[in-house]
Amino acid sequence: MAPTKERPATKTIATNREARHEYFVLEALETGVELKGTEVKSLRAGGVNLKDSWVDIENGELLVKGMHISPYDHGNLFNQDPMRARRLLAHKSEIRRLHQQCKLQGYTLVPLSLYFKHGRVKMEVGLCKGKKLYDKRADAAQRDAKRSIDRAVKSNGKYY
């Protein structure tokens, strides 16, 4: 019998690339996601979109809103509303701390990525501060400069 291959502990389902473009991520927090019915099967099939989602704190609970989980193809009657608010699982002390920072300092909670960790669905939530237009321009200029330097270094060692 052949030896079994170890599966990786984490498998990324979706990332919110727009969040890193629109916000400065000050801190990241791993939370669990409360899902119902066939939503996990839909996530395994890759049917999720984090692009326009955000995290709210209501009644001492973290809720992710605007996250679209596609209905499972074979779910029929048991499928949930694709845009429903889903509860995130975190310690009360963490929720209180995040609530204070959002309320007093004007930060925002944004989902950064969704992944499986040892068979459980986890979400990385970022405590973020919005970028201004000039910050985005500076990031783009820095990225272009890095690309041109890498290109020059790579082409320097080639023969003509």
Per-segment meaning from a language model:
Residues 37, 57-59, 66, 125-129:
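Flexible glycine-/small-residue-rich
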Residues 41-42, 49, 56, 69-72, ...:
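Short, surface-exposed beta-strand-loop junctions and turns on beta-sheet-rich folds
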Residues 30-48:
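Short, contiguous, helix-prone interaction/anchoring segments in small proteins
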Residues 1-31, 36, 144-160:
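Intrinsically disordered, Lys/Arg-rich N-terminal extensions and targeting peptides
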Residues 53-57, 114:
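A structural signal for short hydrophobic beta-strand segments in well-ordered beta-sheet cores
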Residues 56-98:
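Helix-adjacent hinge/juxtasegments
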Residues 83, 90-96, 130-160:
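C-terminal end-helix/capping segment
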Residues 89-126, 130-132:
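Beta-rich strand-turn-strand
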